[in-house]
A protein has these predicted regions:
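C-terminal cap/linker of serine protease catalytic domains
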Residues: 1-17, 113, 166-227, 263, ...
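Conserved active-site neighborhood of the chymotrypsin/trypsin-like protease fold
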Residues: 3-5, 21-119, 152, 175, ...
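Residue-level recognition of beta-strand microenvironments
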Residues: 42, 73-75, 128, 162, ...
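Conserved PDZ fold ligand-binding element
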Residues: 42-46, 167, 241-264
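PDZ/PDZ-like domain micro-motif
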Residues: 153-159, 214-223, 236-254, 269
Length: 299
């Protein structure tokens, strides 16, 4: 007798949990309550920043039960992410999903909150959104919202698809009304930067601005469909924007070729590699599109 669809689904999700469990670790870096983490390299663990309370002598237990010592390699409270460096390159790196999560997909949240092994929670993707302020001073370009139950110790563990591939990293550091996951592509970028530099650079221009509709004559000059921009209403003294040539009355519509329509998008774009570098800003000035190169300051 052939298996019914529910048995097949159940078996598939159990296999997915087992596969992801190989890369899901226990992270003991705070008093009383261990948490979870994801191996993104053989010697690197990605976890949630809020579960890391010390820099040294961090205990990590791998999927095969091996207990290792780790140290904090970098952290970014703004995105609630931290990277740990293992004293041995023994971890099994996680496999990231090739396609992003979609609303309605079945997912599993995986955690390793104790030495007993992995735990899982089943649910569906409720929404894909962003940008979103994390409540910890940072900004994410996107997030995944699910109805999985995030049990104690699940923070830092993966959200996976039916093949055991990682959609993102679970965090309880921000969000309400459902479990929040940081998408894998965004999390891995942060992780790679933290592993290299120990922190995430965040930039600023030193402007005061408000969202406005772009006039029709301005829209006709853009090579993309864009309705809004940021009207500059003030400049800080000796600000990067002022020193670079931006003026009150300019409408900022792009940073390094990427459209800017709202303050949250500007916050997101002014981070990482652009900080400290001359960056082209697209502005509408007197109805004409101009490019102004500004050296982005560091907060």
């Amino acid at each position: 007798m052939s298996k019914n669809i529910f048995t097949e689904l159940s078996d598939a999700m159990a296999s997915a949990a087992e596969q992801a469990g190989n890369s899901t670790v226990l992270v003991d870096a705070r008093r009383r309550f261990p948490a979870s983490g994801i191996a993104f390299a053989k010697d690197m663990i990605l976890t949630a920043d809020h579960v890391v309370e010390r820099d040294e002598d961090i205990k990590v237990i791998l999927g095969d039960g091996t207990e290792l010592t780790a140290r904090l390699a970098g952290r970014d409270p703004g995105t609630d992410l931290a990277v740990l460096k293992l004293d041995s390159a023994s971890a099994v790196p996680a496999v990231v999903a090739k396609t992003p999560a979609r609303v309605g997909q079945f997912v599993l949240a995986i955690g390793r909150p104790s030495k007993r092994g992995i735990e899982s929670s089943f649910g569906t993707v409720n929404a894909i959104g962003g940008p979103v302020r994390t409540g910890r001073g940072g900004m994410l370009e996107s997030f995944i919202k699910t109805d999985v139950v995030s049990y104690p110790g699940f923070s830092g563990g993966p959200l996976i698809n039916g093949e055991g591939q990682v959609f993102g990293i679970n965090t309880s550091g921000f969000g309400s009304g459902g479990a929040i996951t940081i998408p894998a592509d965004a999390a891995w970028k942060v992780a790679e930067t933290l592993a290299k530099h120990g922190k995430i650079k965040r930039g600023y221009l030193g402007i005061r601005s408000q969202t406005v509709n772009i006039p029709e004559d301005g829209q006709s000059q853009l090579k993309r469909k864009q309705e809004n921009g940021l009207l500059i209403v003030g400049l800080e003294a000796e600000s990067p924007a002022g020193n670079g040539g931006l003026m009150v009355g300019d409408i900022l519509v792009g940073v390094a070729g990427e459209a800017i329509e709202h303050h949250d998008e500007l916050f997101t774009r002014l981070s990482g590699d652009v900080v400290g570098k001359s960056t082209p800003l697209d502005v509408l000035r007197g109805g004409r599109l101009e490019v102004v190169n500004v050296v982005v300051g560091e907060r």
